[in-house]
Structures are given as structure tokens and as C-alpha cells.
């Protein structure tokens, strides 16, 4: 399989589709194992059904199923990976019936997490200069994990190879399947390639995948409305929101040293963005917006935290400016930079939620995001931040101006932002709500249950 990647250039979205098709075809060598697993799973369901009809259901109604959460991203620096790491930690600590399954350099198991070594990793064309890759898992290994863990449902956190493999395994074994709409793939494709046909193909394939699921989770109401408009049954859409660690992200983390490293002028207003450095995030437009405000005679500077394929282009754009590109940050350093800034702004149109917007507000700084986006659901316009009319440089500059010029207004918004995040559900609340939604996943096919009951009544069994 590795020779497929080594001997074939992967160019563009179509190339990725061809290679994924070839790899999935190769994986169909596992078909005999899948057929056998499906047969034994059906027999097991039948046996459970007989036992239930004669002796009663040993499982209390409303009990959530043991669930495997499959994700294509875990160790990377992005919102989905952060949520998965948090979930793995909290699942073990809170004894939640969830185990996260993620790609890793080797197969391993520990509390709350199982890592599987991919058969092969596919580089993503738009991120050739980056480490981002999609791992194709072994279906046989996933079957083993389901059997050994006693999983009763599968949840795909991402619609990539792990999610597709999870759907296939769930269907073979007759298990309920859920999926999270974690990334606006069609918008990403359009932003990265400019190819509307490719974006439409991605949209259609994603919609097809969501229609196969028993439940579809989404982080915001706006995204849920969009899925319903695409033909996804609204009755199976659930909101799986996000929490924020208000102890880690706290105004008390404000650091004189961090502030001094970013700007030596106490009167300069510091604008912060924390994001993956890629085209769709709109950071180039944010640079232009800050420059517009500065040209009007205001003391303002931009700090950029993150890494990604657009880093070289952004460094070139910043070469003769006083703005700073700080690279990736995590932990206490990131918390200190958040709390030491004056304004946060993310002019992205592709977010499904925007975890960094929550972290900025928890740190006590007002947040600017484009109107009519999932990001805007996280910010109360005029209270905890400002909804820019669009993601254009001109509209972002217009949103920045009142906060740059009025310190008291800025501080009031920051205080309101902190208070808003303090009243938000905690991560433990969010994960408990997710488990409650799992109770809506049926362990056994109701049609099969009805047929079994009729067989018993007819004296066949």
C-alpha cells in the first residue's frame, strides 16, 4: 500500500479521490473477514433477541451504549483534536462509556484511548508542506477493537478515512452509527482550491455520508440548519457543543513579560489571532485590516499564533511590519498570550464553532468574528465582542476601530466576555450531554426484533 503513495503523484482533489478509491479497493481484500464478522454479529443479535423475549431485557431502558469514537485527528493542533484529547481524558476520569480511537505511530491502548497504526497515510494536497495526513485504518483491526471492547455503537468524529471505516464496520456488524459534522469540507475545498466543481463533489459526498448515520452531531444551531437544508433528517440532528476551560484561560494569566515581548509601547493596542496558518482562515485579510487602522494614526499591532502551510507567505507579508508571527503555542504560554492581548479576531468563514473564540473570551478579551457564521454564535454582538459585517479587510477594520479607540468600551466587553464564558456549560456537562444523546441509538434493529417476536408467537422458535 505504501508503494501506491510512493509511485503515484497526488495532485488536486481528483487525485485524492482516485488514490482513496484505490486504497479502499485494496482494503476489500478484507471482504471475507467482513462477511464472517457480519454473519457472527447477526447470529449474536439473534441469540440476544431470543434471550430478551424469554427472560426480559437485561439492559435498563435509556442506558447509553458503549461507544467507540473514531477520529482522523488527535495529536495535531486544531479544535477537533483538542476536543478528542479532552474527551479521552474525561472519559477515563468520569467512567463514561466512550473510548476514543485515533491514528498513531503504533497501535496502543490506555484509559480512554486506543491508537491504531494506519495501513498508509495520505498527504493532503493543500497541505503538502505541512505534516497533515489522513491515515487509512485496517478494517480487521477495527473489527478486533469492536469485539474486544464490547462496543455497542460507533461514532465518527470526523468524515475522513477513520469515519468511513467506522461506518462500514458499523453496517457490517449491525451497530448504530453516529457522525459529527466537525469540518465544513465543501467550504474548505472552495477556499483552498477555488474549484466549485470539486467543492460540490465534496458537499455531495459528505451529505451522503451523513444520511447513512443514525444520529448526526453538530456543534452549533447554524450548522444544524445548514445540514437540514441539505436534506439531512432534522429528527436525527443533535447539538454537541463545546466547553471552555475557564481555569486555564483566565484574565489572571495576563503577563507583563508576555506583553513586553509583543509590544514595548504600553499604549499600543494588541490584536491577537490564534489559528492554523492556512488560506481559509483569512489571516492575510486580518493583516490588511490592522494595517488600515494603523494608517489612520492609531497605535495597533497584530500577534499571530499558529503554524501551517501559509506560514511562509504570511512571513513574507509581515517582513517589513511590526506585527509578530509567534508560531505554535500550547499550555501556559498560550494562556498568557490570550490574557495579555487586548482584542481577539478570527475572520474565518469555514469554522463549525471556533474553540479559540471561547478561549479568548474566557481570557477576558473582546472578540471580533464575521456575521452569519458559526463563530458568531459564540460571541454576543455588542456585548462580548463585535460581529463584523463580512470577513473582508474593510469590514474587519470597521469592527476593530471602536475597540482600538475606546479603552473603557474594550474593557467592559472583556469583562462581559469572561462572565459569559463562566456561565457556559463545562466540558463535563458537554460530555454528559453527549452520552445522554447516545441513549437514542438503538442497539438492535426494531424490524429484526418484530420479526423475532412474530416467530416466537408463531411457534417457530
Show where each model-derived region lies.
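Conserved donor-binding/catalytic core segment of Leloir-type glycosyltransferases
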Residues: 69, 264-281, 287-291
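Short alpha-helical donor nucleotide-sugar binding micro-motif in glycosyltransferases
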Residues: 210, 328-329, 336-341
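A short helix/loop element that forms part of the nucleotide-sugar donor recognition site in Leloir-type
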Residues: 250-264
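Aromatic "clamp/platform" in nucleotide-sugar-dependent glycosyltransferases that forms part
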Residues: 330, 349
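Short hydrophobic beta-strand element within catalytic cores of glycosyltransferases
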Residues: 366-370, 379
Amino acid at each position: 500500500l505504501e508503494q501506491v503513495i510512493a509511485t503515484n503523484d497526488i495532485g488536486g482533489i481528483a487525485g485524492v479521490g482516485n488514490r482513496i478509491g484505490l486504497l479502499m479497493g485494496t482494503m476489500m481484500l478484507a471482504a471475507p473477514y467482513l462477511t464472517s464478522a457480519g454473519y457472527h454479529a447477526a447470529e449474536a443479535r439473534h441469540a440476544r433477541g431470543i434471550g430478551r423475549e424469554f427472560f426480559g431485557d437485561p439492559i435498563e431502558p435509556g442506558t447509553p451504549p458503549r461507544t467507540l469514537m473514531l477520529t482522523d485527528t488527535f495529536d495535531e493542533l486544531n479544535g477537533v483534536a483538542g476536543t478528542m484529547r479532552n474527551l479521552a481524558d474525561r472519559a477515563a476520569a468520569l467512567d463514561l462509556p466512550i473510548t476514543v480511537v485515533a491514528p498513531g505511530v503504533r497501535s496502543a491502548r490506555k484509559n480512554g484511548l486506543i491508537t491504531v497504526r494506519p495501513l498508509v497515510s495520505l498527504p493532503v494536497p493543500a497541505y503538502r508542506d505541512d505534516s497533515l495526513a489522513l491515515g487509512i485504518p485496517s478494517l480487521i483491526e477495527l473489527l478486533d477493537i469492536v469485539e474486544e471492547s464490547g462496543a455497542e455503537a460507533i461514532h465518527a468524529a470526523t468524515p475522513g478515512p477513520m469515519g468511513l471505516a467506522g461506518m462500514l464496520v458499523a453496517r457490517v456488524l449491525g451497530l448504530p452509527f453516529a457522525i459529527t459534522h466537525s469540518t465544513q469540507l465543501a467550504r474548505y475545498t472552495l477556499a483552498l482550491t477555488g474549484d466549485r466543481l470539486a467543492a460540490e463533489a465534496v458537499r455531495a459526498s459528505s451529505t451522503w455520508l451523513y444520511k447513512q448515520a443514525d444520529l448526526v452531531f453538530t456543534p452549533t444551531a447554524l450548522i444544524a440548519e445548514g445540514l437540514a437544508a441539505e436534506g439531512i433528517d432534522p429528527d436525527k440532528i443533535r447539538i454537541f457543543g463545546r466547553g471552555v476551560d475557564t481555569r486555564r484561560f483566565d484574565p489572571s494569566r495576563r503577563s507583563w513579560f508576555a506583553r513586553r515581548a509583543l509590544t514595548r509601547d504600553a499604549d499600543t493596542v494588541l490584536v491577537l489571532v490564534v489559528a492554523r496558518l492556512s488560506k481559509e482562515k483569512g489571516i492575510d485579510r486580518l493583516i490588511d485590516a490592522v494595517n488600515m487602522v494603523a494608517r489612520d494614526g492609531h497605535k495597533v499591532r497584530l500577534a499571530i499564533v499558529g503554524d501551517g502551510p501559509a506560514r511562509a507567505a504570511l512571513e513574507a507579508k509581515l517582513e517589513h511590519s511590526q506585527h509578530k508571527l509567534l508560531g505554535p503555542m500550547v499550555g501556559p504560554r498560550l494562556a498568557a498570550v490570550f490574557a495579555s492581548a487586548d482584542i481577539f479576531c478570527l475572520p474565518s468563514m469555514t469554522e463549525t464553532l471556533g474553540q479559540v473564540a471561547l478561549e479568548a473570551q474566557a481570557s477576558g478579551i473582546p472578540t471580533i468574528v464575521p456575521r452569519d457564521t458559526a463563530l458568531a454564535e459564540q460571541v454576543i454582538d455588542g456585548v462580548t465582542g463585535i460581529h463584523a459585517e463580512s470577513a473582508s479587510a474593510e469590514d474587519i477594520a470597521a469592527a476593530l476601530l471602536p475597540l482600538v479607540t475606546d479603552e473603557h468600551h474594550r474593557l467592559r466587553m472583556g469583562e462581559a466576555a469572561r462572565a459569559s464564558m463562566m456561565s457556559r456549560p463545562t466540558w463535563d456537562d458537554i460530555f454528559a450531554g453527549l452520552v445522554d444523546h447516545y441513549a437514542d441509538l438503538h442497539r438492535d434493529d426494531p424490524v429484526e426484533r418484530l420479526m423475532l417476536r412474530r416467530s416466537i408467537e408463531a411457534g417457530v422458535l
